Structure formats: structure tokens, C-alpha cells
Design a protein with these regions (language model features):
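N-terminal signal peptide c-region/cleavage motif recognized by signal peptidases
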Residues: 16, 20-21
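Bacterial N-terminal signal peptides that target proteins for export
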Residues: 1-12
Length: 170
């Protein structure tokens, strides 16, 4: 093979890789089936719509990958979302998580406007990635974080058992 042929072959390979690599990532992000959805209400306010997705369309505690999306029905400051997260971890007896993750969540999460979404998507190994309106915000590589975050809604001990049942489709 002469140098011109080798150069053309390498160039063609690089062009093909640039076209096909993004497809695999976008497939990975969209290859989920809905398990369930629910609306969180507090007193007379609609707070958010929550939707749980898995690859199979059914949820097994601790199994990954999972996608969990909150679509907010009101404006919220990031600090208020983190505060509510900490309160829910305290309800579950996981106060240690507040100290461990609160600052990281404050740096990741933006203020949310009505109609915007905040999503958690986990990798097969359980690594957590957050998205705001499908735009990547950042990752938390601790494999236990995702399970503890999802427990706020999916644990049998959640403060919102009716919402949990709807999310799990039971």
C-alpha cells in the first residue's frame, strides 16, 4: 500500500468514527423505557412531575442503568432543591449523605425555572450523571450515590409512598 492509499484509508476511518461514535452515545441516552410517572404535590401546589425509566421498563432496586427525571412545575433556586434533598435523606436516616454530597450538588445544579427538567442517569456500573434539560451538568462517580439519591423516591421508607407506587407502576 502506498502512502497516498494509507493516508486516504486513515482519513476515511477517522471520518467514519466521527459519524458513528455520537450515535452510540445518543442511543445509550435514549434507549430507556418508562417504568412509571407521578406528580408531586404539596398542599395545593404542583411541585414537579417525576418519571422513572430503565432499559427493560421495570425497576429492580440497585440495578443500573436508570434514568430519573424531574420536570419542575414551579421555579426553584438550586439551594432550595439541595435543602429538600438533605431533608429527605434525613427522613431516610441518611444524614451523613448531606454532609458528603450537598456542596457537590450545589455546584452541579442550576436554579430551575418552571418547565425545566433535572435528570439523573446512571451507567451500568452505577455512576451518576446529572442533566439539566438534557444538557450534561456533571458526574458523581461514587457508585453508592445514585442508589441513595433514588431512595428519596423509591425506598419503601420514602416520605411519599403513593408517589413511589406510581413511579414503580404498582
Amino acid at each position: 500500500m502506498n502512502i497516498t492509499t494509507k493516508t486516504c484509508a486513515i482519513t476515511a476511518t477517522m471520518i467514519m468514527a466521527s459519524f458513528f461514535t455520537p450515535l452510540s452515545f445518543s442511543e445509550e441516552q435514549t434507549d430507556f423505557k418508562k417504568v412509571g410517572e407521578a406528580r408531586m404535590e404539596y398542599l395545593f401546589w404542583d411541585v414537579y412531575d417525576a418519571t422513572l425509566y430503565t432499559r427493560s421498563g421495570s425497576y429492580k432496586q440497585g440495578a443500573h442503568p436508570v434514568k430519573f427525571t424531574l420536570t419542575y412545575l414551579r421555579d426553584f433556586a438550586a439551594k432550595d432543591i439541595v435543602k429538600a434533598t438533605k431533608e429527605q435523606w434525613q427522613h431516610l436516616g441518611k444524614s451523613d449523605l448531606s454532609a458528603k454530597y450537598a456542596d457537590k450538588l450545589l455546584t452541579l445544579w442550576p436554579d430551575i425555572k418552571k418547565g425545566e427538567s433535572l435528570s439523573l442517569q446512571t451507567s451500568p456500573s452505577g455512576q451518576a450523571t446529572f442533566y439539566h434539560n438534557d444538557k450534561k451538568l456533571g458526574e458523581i462517580s461514587d457508585s453508592q450515590f445514585a442508589n441513595q439519591f433514588l431512595a428519596i423516591w423509591l425506598s419503601p421508607n420514602t416520605s411519599e409512598p403513593a408517589l413511589r407506587k406510581q413511579l414503580l407502576g404498582i
